[in-house]
Amino acid sequence: MPTVYDFSAPLLAPLLAPLPATLLVPHLDGQPLSLGNFRGRVLLIVNTASLCGFTPQYAGLEVLHRTYRDRGFFVLGFPCNQFGGQEPGSDAGIGAFCEKNYGVTFPLFTKVDVNGPNAHPLFRFLKEEKPGIFGMFGAGAIRWNFTKFLISRKGKVIARYGPAKVPKAIAPAIERLLREE
């Protein structure tokens, strides 16, 4: 699959809406967490699954998280069961799986829908800001597990990456955003 570069991101960044800081996301322990807790941080928001061909990306996501967290970067993982039923487990089971198999320390949240009428408001926002190409759920829909959204310190959705984009390939963009004030 060829790499597609989005040269418009730096030009459009001032026009993009910031991530809603008041939006609550359900942490894996069941407690709601405000996105405002991540204000001023660079984020990589990912819909994840435990039984997917892309599941080994958890390891690469964890490497990114550990490499850059002291500089203000976080990976946020949102399990999703909408693609082939590849995340059938309970929230506790998902957390245990990720910790045991991939040493995941980045924040994981409860299972959410990313498409359709029950899509979590966070993913509705992300798709509005960075619509993808037409997929099985319609224009702008997330096509599969491990779709990634890169968010600047100012809360702007800078880039959207498909599942085949391995985490280490996103490192230069993360570095660039971490250098910006």
Could you tell me what each predicted segment is?
Residues 121-124, 128-181:
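Thiol-/selenol-based redox modules, centered on thioredoxin-like
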